[in-house]
């Protein structure tokens, strides 16, 4: 493969901006071990401005070039993009839509798959359509008395619920409600993040994760890892990334081979069915009765030093740098 100009786009300006920068560091380290790539790291900030690590303001044009505000700098042609952006506008499919419009190849899921997975409403519909068990739920599209009434009925039926903004990631806009006293305020808060809200039955279960990815044209689903939270808590954004997090992670969950096989089969089924590409982290619940429930899909999982995706990939016996090179090469040949 000839010399390739690779744009490493990171940030995004959303709630997961800082995590995106840490993941970009991981990519930079891996790309440094691959010959044939010229890498330019560009950060997208909260104001929608692009700038390099040196602070040069720039933009990605429809001519597939990075054009600098300082016109004395020559435009930098782009052959390939890694959109290392968690949440909006990366996992939402927005940035991928632009790449597709200008015919620029990129790493990760396409715009439609990203959008379908990120939105909890469409994701739930897909899970059910594919015949994959998932948590009981209701959908709401407006914060009003009827929405409050429906949620109160769900709380009465299920005993405890999670109220989730439909279009947010990493547990942002997600609230556990055990009492009717906190229901309306949590619902209002969730609607402040998204025009659609999902109300799910609280599941008392183990939280398992599978790294599902493509390698040399094949779909790989690792053995499930596990997130172990403190009693009566869930894996919030703060629990994921706080220095004093009480959550414990296991790269390989202590479950039977039969359960592991069934979970991995579900992961491959949803990867194929929703037409994912290159990488994903697929999260499941496992109840005390050994019922498997698909929870959610992350189409661009974190790649920080504590993230599960790279750990599970390595535990499976694969090398991240080789995996990355394989997927980039397959698109450029």
UniProtKB/Swiss-Prot annotation:
Keywords of the record: ATP-binding, Cell shape, Cell wall biogenesis/degradation, Cytoplasm, Ligase, Magnesium, Manganese, Metal-binding, Nucleotide-binding, Peptidoglycan synthesis
Q: What is this protein called?
A: D-alanine--D-alanine ligase
* Job of this protein: Cell wall formation.
State its location(s).
Cytoplasm
Q: Which residues bind Mg(2+) 1?
A: 283, 296
In short, the EC number is: 6.3.2.4
> What pathway does the annotation place this protein in?
Cell wall biogenesis; peptidoglycan biosynthesis
Q: Name one GO biological process term.
A: peptidoglycan biosynthetic process
